[in-house]
Amino acid sequence: MNTIIKRFVQQLKISLSTDFWKTLISTLGAVSAVVTLISFVFQVHNPCTLMIVIYFIIVIGGSLIISWLLSRRRDSLKLKLSNTLTVNVNAGDIFDYASDTNYVVIPVNEYFDTVVNTKIVSPSSLHGQFINKYYGYNHIELHEQIENYLTENNVEYIEVTERPNVGGYKKKYPLGTCVPVQVGQVTYVLVALTHFDDEDHAYVELSEFGRCISSVCRFIEKNAGNRPAYMPLMGMGLSRLNQTGQFILKYTLDTIIGVKDLAIPGGLSIIVNPPTAKTLDLNSIKY
């Protein structure tokens, strides 16, 4: 019971926004008109004090409840952008969607590193979590899969002479490069999202970030068929975009919409980690 009350209070706090007050003003007028019409139909003349009090309670109370229901914070979003593209936004753990024959996007760095430590691939990043979850200490196997795919598809790269941290690979691939990795029936799509600077710190420019999103969308369109695809809200972690979750989500959606004639019949879902999801205002996102 306490949890329900706390959730209601939290939702109410979030609802007390400009949208809430706009909705309340219009709802007050509508509810007041309905109550007035009812009193006219039933010929309520010279109402007593009790009737007046009841009238105000119904108008004010009803308006508050209706306004809250209409403007309360949404925790998911479904956007049908075309006959061949529906984008969903949901809160959760991206790995929970790794089932059946789904496509799941994992952002990685431009070297497609597979060594997880505090210097090369952070264990807290999705890149690191993916490696630890499915490959553990057998990261060489993953590296060979990635290398074979990139070689077979003649993906161009730049070979650097050295990197600050020993153990990092030295072939640098263009941002937006996608590599499919099969784990059981699930296809993980590793997408090069970030550069490494001279000290092996990850970063990405906003314009490059947009191109990466476009690239992974095209890859899914080409390969996923009717299978659903899931991607995290990228750019929130170690990529250092230094933008709010709201900005990045809107930018991501705008970029997806801007991909000409994009067709993903199985649907594309953007999965937002719960702490970030709490900061989002999905009510304001409209297309």
What does each model-found stretch correspond to?
Residues 2-287:
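Macrodomain-like recognition of ADP-ribose-binding/processing modules
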